[in-house]
Design a protein with these regions (language model features):
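A structural signal for well-ordered alpha-helical segments within the folded catalytic domains
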Residues: 20-23, 77
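C-terminal helical "tail/cap" subdomain of flavin- and related membrane-associated enzymes
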Residues: 27-153
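Short FAD-binding loop at a beta-strand-to-alpha-helix junction that anchors the flavin cofactor
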Residues: 1-9
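Alpha-helix initiation and capping sites
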Residues: 1, 16-19, 36
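A conserved FAD-binding loop/helix module that cradles the flavin
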Residues: 9-21
Length: 153
């Protein structure tokens, strides 16, 4: 899976990505009698998600290599879990979106970028969750993130 998609294997999504490609290709072949049109539609549909999972896999490697013992990173992970509990379905951790939900990789990446920004802004200059401005954080979550549901395959 990962080899077929020319991505590093640090997100474990190669086979899943390949299965998603199969479903998308079958859908496009059913929708278009002309093979060139079907393949062009398939590429347009899947290329953004392939690029997204490639970036997320590399980001995951860099995170595991460089950040897992960083105090700022650990505080952000702690806040991530707290926000998941405070805003279920709205603040969904990156790993959960990619691994346990059927949403496009490109959507997971875009939401991860937004959520990472929330985490970084909220924890800047803090060493503990006790000193955070929870009303401001909750307001930002509601302003930037809509509720997320699984997308049917």
């Amino acid at each position: 899976g990962d080899a077929a998609h020319a991505m590093v294997p640090f997100h474990g999504q190669g086979m899943n990505c390949a299965f998603e490609d199969c479903v998308a290709l079958a859908r496009q072949l059913d929708a278009h009698a002309d093979l060139a049109t079907a393949f062009a539609a398939f590429e347009a549909e899947r290329k953004p998600d392939a690029a997204a999972i490639q970036r997320m896999a590399l980001d995951n490697y860099l995170e595991m290599r460089d950040r897992v013992d960083d105090a700022d990173y650990l505080l952000q992970r702690e806040l991530e879990l707290a926000l998941q509990a405070r805003h279920p379905g709205r603040f969904v951790p990156h790993y959960a979106m990619v691994t346990f939900m059927r949403i496009p990789y490109s959507l997971a990446m875009a939401r991860t970028d937004i959520q990472r920004g929330i985490l970084e802004r909220a924890t800047a200059g803090h060493a503990t969750l006790d000193t955070l401005d929870w009303p401001a954080i909750d307001a930002e979550v509601h302003a930037l993130l809509t509720p997320l549901e699984d997308v049917p395959g």
